[in-house]
Amino acid sequence: MAKRVKVVLNETINKLGFTGDLVEVAPGYARNYLIPKGLGVVATPGILRQVEQRRLKELERLKAEKDAAEARKVALETIGRFVIKKQVGEAEAIFGTVTTQEVADAVEAATNQSLDRRGISLPDIHKTGFYQAQIKLHPEVIATVEVQVAPL
């Protein structure tokens, strides 16, 4: 009897592997737990080809997402500056602060592209002026734009 059996995982299992991974496990673990519960299948050449095809499709999808994010970055950095108008008090201090939602709304108004406010990082803004904002469009793509806070 074989000491280890190769299994392709259908689901992520803690301390074993992720979906689509080829892992070697004890025959009893595969026969009595993984296969009956649908968590894995015995690795055959056909199954391995299917897993490889899925992996290639996933890589293509991830590359397409990154390319789209790069295009959005170029578009945002071409515009470069977004203006946010706020009510101003003494010494050019604004009432309240500039929020990430306001920046997202300004970007959407200028580009017709919606942004998730959680991907925007701003310094603390309490006065009028120019500030740098970083917009995370993808885990590997970050656009830097200028935010101008102007009096209303």
Swiss-Prot record:
Ribosomal protein as UniProt keyword: yes
UniProt signal peptide: none
Q: Which PROSITE patterns match?
A: RIBOSOMAL_L9 (PS00651)
Q: Which GO terms describe its biological process?
A: translation
UniProt keyword terms in alphabetical order? Ribonucleoprotein, Ribosomal protein, RNA-binding, rRNA-binding
| Cross-referenced SUPFAM superfamilies | L9 N-domain-like (SSF55658), Ribosomal protein L9 C-domain (SSF55653)
Task: Identify a single GO molecular function assigned to this protein.
Answer: structural constituent of ribosome
Superkingdom of this protein's organism:
Bacteria
Alphabetical GO CC annotations of the entry are: cytosolic large ribosomal subunit
Instruction: Quote the Pfam families the UniProt record gives.
Output: Ribosomal_L9_C (PF03948), Ribosomal_L9_N (PF01281)
Instruction: Please give the function described in this protein's UniProt entry.
Output: Binds to the 23S rRNA.
Sequence similarity: Belongs to the bacterial ribosomal protein bL9 family.
- HAMAP family reported in the protein's UniProt record: Ribosomal_bL9
Its protein name is Large ribosomal subunit protein bL9
In its UniProt entry, the species of origin is given as: Synechocystis sp. (strain ATCC 27184 / PCC 6803 / Kazusa)
